[in-house]
Amino acid sequence: MEKERETLQAWKERVGQELDRVMAFWLEHSHDREHGGFFTCLGRDGRVYDDLKYVWLQGRQVWMYCRLYRKLERFHRPELLDAAKAGGEFLLRHARVAPPEKKCAFVLTRDGRPVKVQRSIFSECFYTMAMNELWRVTAEARYQSEAVDMMDQIVHWVREDPSGLGRPQLPGAVASESMAVPMMLLCLVEQLGEEDEELAGRYAQLGHWCARRILQHVQRDGQAVLENVSEDGEELSGCLGRHQNPGHALEAGWFLLRHSSRSGDAKLRAHVIDTFLLLPFRSGWDADHGGLFYFQDADGLCPTQLEWAMKLWWPHSEAMIAFLMGYSESGDPALLRLFYQVAEYTFRQFRDPEYGEWFGYLNREGKVALTIKGGPFKGCFHVPRCLAMCEEMLSALLSRLA
């Protein structure tokens, strides 16, 4: 027991120190003090190599700053709050393409002019998360009003009428459901319902619907988690149907663990650990070089995506959260061992001891393939969210052992 406590304590200190280093990188290099919002296209040393702004990453960074400000005392600092508010105001002014319509841009110029729109819900989802967290740290009702209004629009697009997303209905297109959509909605349900009984009640049934839809992606008699299924929850043919993303399954796993914890469903918890944590790890971990493959084919065929064998930052961040949460909820020491295995690989291969933050893209052997620290898909989100959540869970575990 004493050795376990010492190991947990060492990891808590290691994770906390790394969170401080990661946040120092973003605080120093990413703030646009002229227009508000954040630069996310940052080179290894933090230099800005492109000033385009990606709305989903803007929302994520606002959310992350507010969350740290609210949850961890050492981040309760004016510079975080001021930057989050400036980012939130930038989103309020510029994110929506044609107000009062709710559709948000995917890419903006530095000063906020729309460049590109995606026919998906993800910019809007992270806009919602940002506004809800801003409300929590400022108590300004206008932010919460924005969050709830956008949430209602997202639910309408997903469950009633997607035509507002602008996606054409083509006769040859397969009707499919990506696991990302119910995952994202479940994340929003958890976000808006936190310590808010009214909204928690309002979205309770939606949360259960999301969980059921995610669970439909467990196919082949429980032996595979597939990224895409039919609208009826059946396996699809071809590459689309066989497509697997181990890191995404692990992220879905901790979303479902959090849902099962709030609903007190021990049976669901056990099922999730088996199918969304252990199964993707067994198939997705590279036995030769370590790390999680980015994509896989459920039949063992060669995936068509060029990056399938690369090791990316975010699946490893999500795996750390998933295994530590699984251990915290179940007490199964095998899950704690998997947390240590993933965390050791991740800290060894991804972190940059010279300039701070983490590299995002490694080749199969674990060597750095892209030296950038941020871009269109990597911002101030997966790494600090992982580190902050792991620090909180490790603190709670140590308190239980005391």
Curated annotation (Swiss-Prot):
Temperature dependence: Optimum temperature is 47 degrees Celsius.
GO terms (BP aspect): carbohydrate metabolic process; N-acetylglucosamine metabolic process; N-acetylmannosamine metabolic process; N-acetylneuraminate catabolic process
Pfam families the UniProt entry points to: GlcNAc_2-epim (PF07221)
Primary role: Catalyzes the interconversion of N-acetylglucosamine to N-acetylmannosamine. Involved in the N-glycolylneuraminic acid (Neu5Gc) degradation pathway.
Outcome when changing L185D: Fails to bind renin or to form a dimer
Family affiliation: Belongs to the N-acylglucosamine 2-epimerase family.
Cleavable signal peptide: none
GO molecular function, one term: peptidase inhibitor activity
Highest taxon of the lineage: Eukaryota
Region (Leucine-zipper): 185-206
Keywords from the UniProt entry: Isomerase
Site-annotated residues for Important for enzyme activity: C380
Organism, as annotated: Sus scrofa
Protein name stated in the entry: N-acylglucosamine 2-epimerase
Known tissue expression: Kidney, liver, adrenal, and pituitary glands the amount being much greater in kidney than in the other tissues.
pH-dependent activity: Optimum pH is 6.8.
Catalytic reaction equation(s): an N-acyl-D-glucosamine = an N-acyl-D-mannosamine
